[in-house]
C-alpha cells in the first residue's frame, strides 16, 4: 500500500471522543476538501475525498456532532482522474453547518483561512485540524532525498493558518506556492515522524521509518561499494571517527552545548557518511564546508576542555583502532 493511502486509512479509523476535537476536524476537512456553493438560492456544503473512509468519517461526524444529514456520492475515475472520488454534500442545512463550523463568519462571509475557534483552540484541536487537512488533501512520499509530507490548500490564507497550527505543535512547516497551487510542506524526517505520531498514525510511522532506515543503509552500502579511491575511503573513515567524537562530546557537555554547535553536531551524528560539504548543504541556513567544520571543531575542543576539568575521558577516547587504521 502506498504511504499516503496507508496514512489516510489509519487516520480515518482513529477514535476521537472529545467534541471540540471532532468539531476542529470537521471544520478542517470541509475547508481543505470542500467549498460552499449557491444552488437555487441555498448554500450547499460539499467536500471531495479520494477515499471512501474519509468521506464516511466526515458524514458520521456531521451527523453526530451537528445533527445534520449529508449524502455521499461516488464519482468514477476518468482519463484525468484515475481513482474514484467521494463527495460529501449537505443540502438541507448547508448554511447552518457552514456557520456552525466557522466556514462563514457572523456576517455570512466566507472565511478564507481556518475558523478562529480552530486557530486559537487547544493542542488537541491543532492535532485534529491537521488530521482533517491530511485526510482532505494530504500526501506522504516515500523516504528519500525528496521525501515530504504535504497538504494542498485552497488558498494562501488556509496554508498560512495550517503552518501556524503546526507551529503550536512544535513542528516546522513551510507554505509554498508551486505552479499556482498553495501547499504546506514538511521535509524534515524527524518532523514528519513527530506529526504522524501526534495524528495517531503509529502503524504508518513504523512502516515509513523502516523504509527510511532501509534506504539509508542501502545508500551507505552503495557509497562504500563505489569508493574506488583510497582518499574517499579515508574521508569516510574520518567522518565516522568525527561522528564518534561528536557523540562523546554531546555526552560530556549535556545541556551546556550552545545551540549552533549542537545543530552542527546533530547533523554529523545523523549523517555519519556525509562529507563536510554535504553537511553544510543540509544545515538550515546552508553553511560552507569551512563553517560547518569550524563549528564541529569548537564543539570537540569545548568538550575536551570540560573533560579535562572533570578528570574524565575526552572525545578521542571514543575512537576505535578501525577508525584510526591507515589504508593498507
Curated annotation (Swiss-Prot):
Keyword flag DNA-binding: yes
Domain of life from the UniProt record: Bacteria
Molecular function as annotated in GO: DNA binding
InterPro entries the record matches: Homing_endonucl, Sporu_reg_WhiA_N_dom, Sporulation_regulator_WhiA, Sporulation_regulator_WhiA_C, WhiA_LAGLIDADG_dom
DNA-binding positions: 275-308
Family annotation (Gene3D superfamilies): Homing endonucleases (3.10.28.10)
UniProt-listed Pfam families: HTH_WhiA, LAGLIDADG_WhiA, WhiA_N
Role according to the record: Involved in cell division and chromosome segregation.
PANTHER family, A to Z: CELL DIVISION PROTEIN WHIA-RELATED
Record family assignment: Belongs to the WhiA family.
Protein name: Probable cell division protein WhiA
Amino acid at each position: 500500500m502506498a504511504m499516503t493511502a496507508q496514512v489516510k486509512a489509519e487516520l480515518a479509523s482513529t477514535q476521537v471522543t472529545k467534541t471540540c476535537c471532532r468539531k476542529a476536524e470537521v471544520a478542517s476537512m470541509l475547508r481543505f476538501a470542500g467549498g460552499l456553493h449557491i444552488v437555487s438560492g441555498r448554500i450547499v456544503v460539499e467536500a471531495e475525498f479520494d477515499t471512501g473512509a474519509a468521506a464516511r468519517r466526515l458524514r458520521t461526524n456531521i451527523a453526530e456532532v451537528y445533527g445534520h444529514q449529508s449524502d455521499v456520492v461516488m464519482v468514477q475515475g476518468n482519463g484525468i482522474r484515475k481513482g474514484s472520488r467521494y463527495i460529501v454534500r449537505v443540502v438541507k442545512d448547508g448554511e447552518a453547518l457552514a456557520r456552525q463550523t466557522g466556514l462563514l463568519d457572523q456576517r455570512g462571509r466566507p472565511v478564507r483561512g481556518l475558523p478562529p475557534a480552530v486557530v486559537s483552540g487547544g493542542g488537541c484541536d491543532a492535532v485534529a485540524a491537521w488530521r482533517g487537512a491530511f485526510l482532505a488533501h494530504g500526501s506522504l512520499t516515500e523516504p528519500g532525498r525528496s521525501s515530504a509530507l504535504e497538504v494542498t490548500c485552497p488558498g494562501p490564507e488556509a496554508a498560512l493558518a495550517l503552518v501556524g497550527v503546526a507551529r503550536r505543535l512544535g513542528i516546522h512547516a513551510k507554505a509554498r506556492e508551486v505552479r499556482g497551487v498553495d501547499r504546506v510542506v514538511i521535509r524534515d524526517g524527524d518532523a514528519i515522524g513527530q506529526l504522524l505520531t501526534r495524528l495517531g498514525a503509529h502503524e504508518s510511522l513504523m512502516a515509513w521509518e523502516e523504509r527510511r532506515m532501509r534506504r539509508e543503509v542501502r545508500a551507505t552500502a552503495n557509497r562504500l561499494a563505489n569508493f574506488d579511491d583510497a582518499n574517499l575511503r579515508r574521508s569516510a573513515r574520518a567522518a565516522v571517527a568525527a561522528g564518534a567524537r561528536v557523540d562523546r562530546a554531546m555526552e560530556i557537555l549535556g545541556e551546556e552545548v550552545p545551540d549552533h554547535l549542537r545543530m552542527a553536531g546533530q547533523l554529523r551524528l545523523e549523517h555519519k557518511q556525509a562529507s563536510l560539504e554535504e553537511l553544510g548543504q543540509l544545515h538550515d541556513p546552508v553553511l560552507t564546508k569551512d563553517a560547518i567544520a569550524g563549528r564541529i571543531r569548537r564543539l570537540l575542543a569545548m568538550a575536551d576542555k570540560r573533560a579535562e576539568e572533570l578528570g574524565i575521558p575526552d572525545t578521542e577516547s571514543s575512537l576505535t583502532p578501525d577508525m584510526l587504521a591507515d589504508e593498507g
